[in-house]
Amino acid sequence: KATTANAHPHLSNDGRLVLVHNGIIENYQELRRMLEAEGFVFHSETDTETAVHLIDREYKKRGSLEEAVIAGVKQLCGAFAFCIMHKDEPDKIIAVRQNAPLIIGLGQGENFIASDIPAIIGKTRNIIHLADGELAVVRRESVEVKNLNGENVIKPVEEIEFSPDVISKLGYKHFMLKEINEQPDILRKCLANHLPAPDAPISVGDATLNPDVEKIKNICIIACGTSLHAAMYARTLWEEWLQLPVCVEAASEYIYRRNLTDENTLVIGISQSGETADTISAVRQAKEKGAQLLVLTNRPDSSIVRCCDNVVPLNAGIEVSVAATKSYTAQLAALYLLGLYLAEQKSSLDGRVLSEMKRDLLLLPAQTEEILSHSADIQKQARKLCTFRSFVYM
């Protein structure tokens, strides 16, 4: 519930410890009951405040913020990332990650903590990716990474590549409008990487599937949010093209459900950011069951890539806007191409039909440009429709 009391940051009862949080604490209710029984007073309905009081409880026992964070985090279940400060240790921030994205940006006389790279573009090119169960003690001049046993961890510093255009609106009113207009070029790039000519075989880049695709008896596509909509689109096409059962699972359901994934299942995980906790967990679970794995992501430097060798990069570029535009288009194009690739390998589509579909696909960037050229008409319709509270699509 959006209220002032529920808003971050959250404070300990004495106001000396402060915390911000991204994620979900699954066992917060039982911890809250324990803390309330010990006299801690809660002012919000959030799971975040439970973490504040839990770490404060441990700090009062130990007198060390680092030790208190480690002891507190070990009692939490879920997917979360925290930043914590204490008035007694004012020169540092402790950041900790468990199943939620967190990076450290390294600057000169300054360091940054963020959940994703776009937040620090323009500030630094040097970053450290924290792994699950790691914390960083961040000071102005230094960053020290440790595990939850308090042991130092040596982390590689990665240099991120980006164009200055990424953080510029390039004359557009806002990033979403800019990213909508980037879609034709994103489609061209996708097609150039996977289908250079209508008579060429489709390529999936460095990804390698079992050469005997006949061993694939079913396909399961795992995703969340917008990516889940892209997956449902793929299911409609693939079942017709491949003559195989294709299931689409919300990653949050897949990880808790008893499913029949095995070595004859092709499991495809889709995550724009590559940091979607449930999708990463689902991909890991499918890997343990021996499934063939493939991941589609827009972020080749992300966590999901580290748990799967087969990656089809979307190459849509960093998406600053919250609303998915060009990344969703890239997902649709990549899934269409991947479906045609599998159909080629299985010979499940007539050759002439396949060639015609390829030719039509190569026309898509120009057709998208044609649609976007009617921006004045689109704006006129948008102004008319924006007052409606709901839409029914048939």
Which ranges hold each PLM region?
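Short, well-ordered alpha-helix to beta-strand connector turns
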Residues: 14, 124, 216, 264, ...
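Glycine-rich phosphate-binding loops that contact phosphosugars or nucleotide phosphates
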Residues: 211-363
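Structural beta-sheet core signal
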Residues: 19, 84, 95, 221, ...
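Predominantly extracellular/luminal regions of secreted and cell-surface proteins
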Residues: 177, 181-182
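Short gly/ser/thr-rich secondary-structure transition/capping motifs
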Residues: 199-205, 247-253, 293-295, 373-376
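Short, flexible loop segments at the rims of nucleotide/cofactor-binding pockets, characterized by
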Residues: 198-200, 245-247, 269-273, 368-373
